[in-house]
From Swiss-Prot:
This is 2-dehydro-3-deoxygluconokinase/2-dehydro-3-deoxygalactonokinase. NCBIfam families: KDG_KDGal_kin. Substrate binds at G34, S35, E36, L37, N38, Y90, Y106, Y107, R108, R166, D258, D294. Homohexamer; trimer of dimers. Optimum pH is between 7 and 8. Coiled coil: none annotated. The gene is kdgK. ATP binds at N164, I165, R166, K226, L227, G228, S229, K230, G231, G255, A256, G257, D258. Pfam families: PfkB.
Amino acid sequence: MVDVIALGEPLIQFNSFNPGPLRFVNYFEKHVAGSELNFCIAVVRNHLSCSLIARVGNDEFGKNIIEYSRAQGIDTSHIKVDNESFTGIYFIQRGYPIPMKSELVYYRKGSAGSRLSPEDINENYVRNSRLVHSTGITLAISDNAKEAVIKAFELAKSRSLDTNIRPKLWSSLEKAKETILSILKKYDIEVLITDPDDTKILLDVTDPDEAYRKYKELGVKVLLYKLGSKGAIAYKDNVKAFKDAYKVPVEDPTGAGDAMAGTFVSLYLQGKDIEYSLAHGIAASTLVITVRGDNELTPTLEDAERFLNEFKT
């Protein structure tokens, strides 16, 4: 039995070596990434097993993703190699036009990952897991990928969802709102991961306490409310925990939220309280933003403990 299953599209990332407009960048670093893959790595590094249900192309990038994922301890037995399409890629423009922020340019339309479908879901495998995770990204990339998430959520004992609304992937923000709210209304979500921007789209509020009240009315049990450079708040049973962000040099913030989410969810599943899980999630996201690459610095449980005990800002 696997502890956690994530559904989504793994991607190859080309991260600009220097900040600035992509038209002036000559050198890039290649990384394996993708929101759900990043989430899985955080889960594994906190001592739970995790499987990624996905598709990659029958190409060198697809092989790279499978080999890298396996090396990180992810169960890759449910990553399907699709002979009809290609592995998606994206480029990161760092520090321009907003310092310490990154912009993503995707080349993924029609990719193998977007061809994820309900037929890729092994029903018994999903039923026997403890929790199924996905994101608004997977809900956005294609109708069949959305249906795969719905099928997995139907079978799941427990669910977590990261709203992760990427406007470039949706036909409209209204469509994003309609789709994600339909999921929240239909399924009990054990842990919802979101932020003020997404909550403004979904509920037309940004205040964390008001957001928790409204999400709770929709059946959300635990809310992880990310505040970027201001830290994050977690809620459960009307108990609220806040953890401020650490001040560190920001190389690339991409992937920080995935590291926080995977760390928080995995520790919560192990019976840790929201304060402990949140502190470790903040530690993970802090380390990730200091380098290029989404998941290489996602810490193990032990390294996060050391960070929390020794690092002061």
